[in-house]
Amino acid sequence: MVMKQMKTELKPDRYREGATQDERLLERVEDLQAMGMDAWRIFRIMGEFVEGFEEMSEIGPAVSIFGSARASSDTPMYQECVETARLLGEAGFAIITGGGPGMMEAANRGAKEGGATSVGCNIELPFEQESNDFIDVSIDFRYFFVRKTMFVKYAEAFVIFPGGFGTMDELFESLTLIQTHKVRHFPLVLFGSEYWGGLLDWLRDTMVDEGKITREDLDMIFV
């Protein structure tokens, strides 16, 4: 009974209302017409890469800053993010963010205050994330993996403020890329020791102790 219910709930519906581009891409399909559509989708993906590369190619040295979209502008962490981005901007770095509200807005605001190029890589979401008002170069993406390529390819470092699943995704993908030598080692800074302390304890006391990662792997992270 449980398995039957799961099959019903998990059955993909490619044409259902509100399906995102990522959902449509990842759904398993069986009819040949839909499979043909998947083959043609590669051109849309390629187009996103081309647009991203063209827009980002002349921004110069940059730092990608991540953090929660839900952070309020009246919190100390928001103001610290503004200040961090401002100082990086004054040092000659463009600032790259996900282009949305919260910490992304704070970083783009700081970039503007520091006289730096402020880049927002926005993503299509079901709840329609809108770009913030502090962006010089705005690029819209349908696919997360294309967007994340821009964060890594054009950044000299990552600064990661407290955030949720999206922030964790960006953190652990960058750690994986560095660990597997898919990209050169670059500074990966976690801002806010109190917030990140529990995660770092778990990495050290569980993952290292059980041999899932090495103690040297933790040297990739600065707090």
Regions flagged by a language model, labelled:
Residues R142-E194:
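Active-site/ligand-binding-proximal alpha/beta "capping" segment
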Residues K112, E173-I178, R204-V208:
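Short, solvent-exposed amphipathic alpha-helical segments in soluble enzyme
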Residues Q79, G102-F161:
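Acidic/glycine-enriched connector segments
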Residues L125-E130, T167, Y195-G198:
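Short gly/pro/ser/thr-enriched loop/turn and capping motifs at secondary-structure boundaries
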Residues P61-S64, F93-A94, A116-G120, D136-S138, ...:
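Structural motif
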Residues F191-V223:
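C-terminal functional extensions of proteins
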Residues M56-E58, L87-G89, A111-K112, Q129-D133, ...:
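Solvent-exposed alpha-helices and their adjacent loops that cap or buttress functional pockets
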Residues V2-D22, E27-C121:
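Glycine-rich beta-alpha loop segments
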